Amino acid sequence: MNKIERQQQIKQLIQAEHIGTQEEIRRLLQKDGIVVTQATLSRDLREIGLLKLRDDRGKLYYSLSEPVATPFSPDVRFYVLKVDRAGFMLVLHTNLGEADVLANLIDNDAIEDVLGTIAGADTLLVICRDEEIAKRFEKDLAAGL
């Protein structure tokens, strides 16, 4: 089996179920008759561009990344510890004293669908144009956590 076929198989496994570790992926591949070293698997996962997401119970799992351009500057993700959404509003949690820095970054990005921000000491309220945009931004920001 060549690299492309192996990576296709990995993508199918990731789409079929929530897999949380490289060891789980390696075992599932082995069940299908594909033996890979940890180093090869690690390289494959990096090349595929998998994301580590958290499910509703807090368990981490791999997910295929979608090539979506983020409207936020790369520095924004550095400050976000947690993302919550209430309708068309996002609540971004930061370390103490960093919410205003994050607000300035988002305001400077001049994102058309962000109507405004309000910062506290460690919490930032981001008001989005509508709920769908808030959902998209929530997913985008949460993917970087």
From Swiss-Prot:
Pathway assignment: Amino-acid biosynthesis; L-arginine biosynthesis [regulation]
Pfam families listed in its UniProt record: Arg_repressor, Arg_repressor_C
Keyword Protein transport applies: no
GO cellular component, one term: cytoplasm
Keywords from the named record: Amino-acid biosynthesis, Arginine biosynthesis, Cytoplasm, DNA-binding, Repressor, Transcription, Transcription regulation
Signal peptide: none
A GO MF term: arginine binding
Tagged with keyword Repressor: yes
GO annotation terms (biological process): L-arginine biosynthetic process; protein complex oligomerization; regulation of arginine biosynthetic process
Predominant cellular place of this UniProt entry's protein: cytoplasm
Compartments in which it is found: Cytoplasm
Family: Belongs to the ArgR family.
Function: Regulates arginine biosynthesis genes.
HAMAP family on file: Arg_repressor (MF_00173)
Protein name: Arginine repressor
Gene that this sequence comes from: argR
